[in-house]
């Protein structure tokens, strides 16, 4: 048996990256060694268990060392293959743009391998297949993410399953304290998280901070879970009979994340799930997994017990394994319609609870009485922010009446936006995520031109000095678009604003409602009556009135509908708590022992 102390991961967090893995192993395992016992450092364990001792009923979450060793050994037992623990060493960062340190190593470095998190330990995958994580502004390889093996996936699910009984019985006040500490650690490490997101995903540093902050709000909301998870009680429903309902955790839950919000979407998922008492399997996007790994380490430092949160990486096979595994009770997904409907159908066929948030075509309706400057700024920010890679991006604008004066002003202001690497201080928008994404966006722009739309502003051929290899597309505006065009029917997911014209308010509402998507819609007007009509008549699930991106704060729920959502319960808010819990109803009666037995159906009528 090989004992490896797990390194405190402050070194990687200080540089905005994830923990380095065992790149050049000097220790090999003998063929008959099929078990690896991984012990966290005593310092880390002490921090993580300090909170458990504070439970109101003095519940002890710390198991004996022998029990911990036995359990972890069992979780990591894989016949013929060992889960390789991280070697306790810090590897110099490969590129200057990833580090906050002023000095960089001149030694050539191989990209680090992103670890899985299984049973409280970061372990290197034994997979033979890895995917490059690429900086979209430079095309440099940041790291390599594994296609997790089936044995490793099963070990992660087993760890979550075995952690569940103790975690669900942990006082809810203790679980809340973990979240309180977690939100504090996120705030302290926000700059490093933002740098990692900008490096891997491409969005500007300011936008990366927004990504983290919107997720942080969900963590803060989860700190009040004792109130959110309350049940209902009604005394004397019959003679001497009381009935109450309680909300209990489901068990092992899973989350499958997209590339466009590397911090926010994971924070929509696992903080709510684990604070309800569940354990969790997180699959980050293979394009930008670093933020999820950093967040997981912060969660463990905050006191989350081993096995409560696990991370597995991969693509289709990992997703299918999540859908098929009988021990996983619920799956939360954000991503494309193709993937979302596949996951919904496959997981639902296995009896799982599903929430699947998918594609969008969000419309902004502009009435002639709208405030000109405020509306133009809103359209630019919502259409081109994050290079248009938001599920709530305002990608389509419908002008009622004259459109030309609005379009001319839009073009003028869009030309002033700075397109460059997201880490540059003056960047307004960065690159799109990949070369394939850029090619698809450019194809849809050209399809609009071919179908008769007018290209008012073309950002396809932009070249950014110093970042010539980047996946950059400048702000692009198409005018005269009609509902039958592919550029309108498809979600472009890039910095492209599609402009349409309607002769009347009612016609504009009809155009919006005929679109298959229903994530969000916004109106820009000075008329309260028009705003109220819009609110009542529009079928989209989230409405903005002079608000371009109406994403609700977490005490409400994210409520996309139509083709933008599949499932019965939405993300966060009350619906999110309901999704990660199940209702148990208890009917009780305390009275003297009866002298006779009645076989009649019980009713509320006095017998």
Swiss-Prot record:
Which domain of life, per UniProt? Eukaryota
User: What residues form the catalytic site here?
Assistant: 391
**Catalyses which reaction(s):** 2-methyl-3-oxopropanoate + NAD(+) + CoA + H2O = propanoyl-CoA + hydrogencarbonate + NADH + H(+)
User: Where in this protein does the record put region Disordered?
Assistant: 1-69
Tell me if Transport is a UniProt keyword of this record.
Answer: no
Question: Which residues make up the binding site for NAD(+)?
Answer: 259, 283, 286-287, 336, 491
Q: Where is this site: Transition state stabilizer?
A: 260
Composition bias of kind Polar residues appears in: 9-30
Q: Which GO terms describe its cellular component?
A: cytosol; mitochondrion
Q: Does the keyword rRNA-binding apply?
A: no
Presequence range in chain numbering: 1-98
**Gene3D superfamilies, sorted:** Aldehyde Dehydrogenase, Chain A, domain 1 (3.40.605.10), Aldehyde Dehydrogenase, Chain A, domain 2 (3.40.309.10)
Write down the SUPFAM superfamilies for this protein, in alphabetical order: ALDH-like (SSF53720)
Named from the GO MF annotations, one term is: copper ion binding
Where is this gene product found?
Answer: Mitochondrion
Main location class: mitochondrion
Q: Which InterPro entries match?
A: Ald_DH/histidinol_DH, Ald_DH_C, Ald_DH_CS_CYS, Ald_DH_N, Aldehyde_DH_dom, MeMal-semiAld_DH
| Basic residues: compositionally biased ranges | 42-51
Q: Which UniProt keywords apply?
A: Mitochondrion, NAD, Oxidoreductase, Transit peptide
Q: Which family does it belong to?
A: Belongs to the aldehyde dehydrogenase family.
Name of the protein: Methylmalonate-semialdehyde dehydrogenase [acylating], mitochondrial
- The gene behind this protein is ALDH6B2
